[in-house]
Amino acid sequence: MYQIITPLNLALNTGAGFICRTFDRDAAFIQGYMQEAQFHQGAALIEILQNCPIFNDGIFDPIIEKKNQAEKVLRLKHGEPLLFGENNEWTILLDRMEVKKVEAASLDQAQWWIHDETSKFKAHVLSQLGQGEYHDLPVAMGVIYKTPRKFIEKQYNDYNSILEQKINQ
């Protein structure tokens, strides 16, 4: 079986500095994410899960219908623990490179995974939740990865300045 190629992992592996996922019925969040992406320095990708009534009608309904969101959607907030469920009773545990769904109450709070949107490693893991080998876990929604990048023009100008200094020495 082939490994699933996702837009988020593709963006992570090609150097995008802002990576986010949301769904089409989440208008309030989409607007905020669009503004963040617009003002982000560097490449940005927002994956929007959206049904197509002709080719894949209802494909995301098991995830994004209100009655399923508590168990199927993991809302990401920088600096906050990854909790989900009707009463936030579940968490995601990263244990020796293995991702597990565990009862939050069974762990000391120090063991909870705190979302760090600057961690590229954790961003790779979060982008895979809800699919492939992690199909039984909730789908991560929100800013998955964010780090400022220099614009290519700035890098080019910095490089030219260094070259000019070396030539003029």
What is each model feature region?
Residues 54-169:
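Flexible, low-complexity linker and terminal segments
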Residues 17, 22, 40-47, 71-79:
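A conserved active-site cap/scaffold subdomain adjacent to cofactor or substrate pockets
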Residues 3-6, 47, 161:
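Proteins with a high burden of low-complexity, intrinsically disordered sequence enriched in S/T/G/P/A and R
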Residues 1-37:
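Conserved thiamine diphosphate
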